[in-house]
Amino acid sequence: MKQNFFAVDLGATSGRTILGSFIEGGLNLEEINRFPNHLIEVGGHFYWDIYALYRHIIDGLKLVAHRGESIASIGIDTWGVDFVLLGKDGNLLRQPYAYRDPHTVGAPEAFFSRISRSEVYGKTGIQVMNFNSLFQLDTLRRNHDSALEAADKVLFMPDALSYMLTGKMVTEYTIASTAQLVNAHTQRLEPELLKAVGLQEENFGRFVFPGEKIGTLTEEVQKITGLGAIPVIAVAGHDTGSAVAAVPALDRNFAYLSSGTWSLMGVETDAPVITAETEALNFTNEGGVEGTIRLLKNICGMWLLERCRLNWGDTSYPELITEADSCEPFRSLINPDDDCFANPADMEQAIREYCRTTGQPVPEQRGQIVRCIFESLALRYRQVLENLRALSPRPIETLHVIGGGSRNDLLNQFTANAIGIPVVAGPSEATAIGNVMIQAMTVGEATDVAGMRQLISRSIPLKTYHPQDMAAWDAAYIHFKNCVR
């Protein structure tokens, strides 16, 4: 009998629900509903509308129920670091802050005045970024935030949504690891860091790993959706964790690039790699499935283009890619990870101003802006990959690009040109596939991650890009390193 697995995949700009099932020869995915996920700006702060996300999930479940389809289980993954605060009565105390909120500017330095940067990194192996949950929580503590002071529980976004569906509070390992609150060696919440932000382990839900059952739909949700007591399974709650589980690699000599709003480049390791070098380069060790560690670097990704598109109306990606392809190469380059691109009011203007202040031609046409973004991303990927090669316990012979960005032929070719090794693109739905596969492993439909990857490689169309024009890209890389600030 065919089993359907309901995957909820929420990104920082959009979300969707997907029904996955196994068919002869592979995996079938059907999108049930897709919806925007917008920042809400109120009083100079940025929040997520978790109630809207919950409503969209309920809508997806109702659509499946209306068709008479059965669901074997449900899994939820989201972006990282953001969280919900619950009172003693189990109710949400307010909408969660979004990680792009400016209140964490300078937060790491404030925290390190009490516990040193090296000590924090030595425990967690997580790269230092302003918006890590550790620093968000410490910012709220220092600001005497009323919601934090009243909070009984802290739930990360995927865990908060599973709580709204099941009434059960959990803390899933991969999403907690990303938060910089988990000891990378013990794979448990780190008591010293919790104490530093005024919390204890009791302020979090039951600690679970991917593949564990969270609970079943509450009677209320069953009544609203018309479904039964369907189990909700902890997948890799951090979307990158689910995505990397779906990398269609047949050996381990690969790096991955999860390409979406963020670009996350890394390798899989069997143990944390926490050294003076990884600390200096600000690489992160995030928890993965089956006990693996994702040694990776966060790179700003399609956020740059997504924000530019806000000014460009309904222009499609193919149109923009065609315009970029016809523009002069290497005219202007930026550092995608410069702070000025974190959340500017006008991304186009921020890019132009960066080029102006670094003495480069200022992009005027839309195609020039897009080409600047793509070339700069590809060259930044090369820079990060060079560091990754020095840190990886295995050689890197292929780069697997997964996620929505894997559909971008021009950027994929630029990336192959820049890094000098083959780029294998796909699947674009890696996060949803990983989500479904982890659910399927729980009920025995799939055996292990290696078997999952073989199935994906056989059943999902992939495209390989080989390096071209390497001399020109080598020269551009020198220019890139000289002009980034």
UniProtKB/Swiss-Prot annotation:
This is Rhamnulokinase. Pfam families: FGGY_C, FGGY_N. Its cofactor is Mg(2+). ATP binds at A12, T13, S14, G15, R16, T261, E306, G404. Pathway: Carbohydrate degradation; L-rhamnose degradation; glycerone phosphate from L-rhamnose: step 2/3. Keywords: ATP-binding, Disulfide bond, Kinase, Magnesium, Nucleotide-binding, Rhamnose metabolism, Transferase. The keyword Kinase applies. It is an enzyme of class 2 (transferase). Its EC number is 2.7.1.5. InterPro entries: ATPase_NBD, Carb_kinase_FGGY, FGGY_C, FGGY_N, Rhamnulokinase. The active site is at D239 (proton acceptor). One of its GO terms (biological process) is rhamnose catabolic process. Involved in the catabolism of L-rhamnose (6-deoxy-L-mannose). Catalyzes the transfer of the gamma-phosphate group from ATP to the 1-hydroxyl group of L-rhamnulose to yield L-rhamnulose 1-phosphate. Belongs to the rhamnulokinase family.
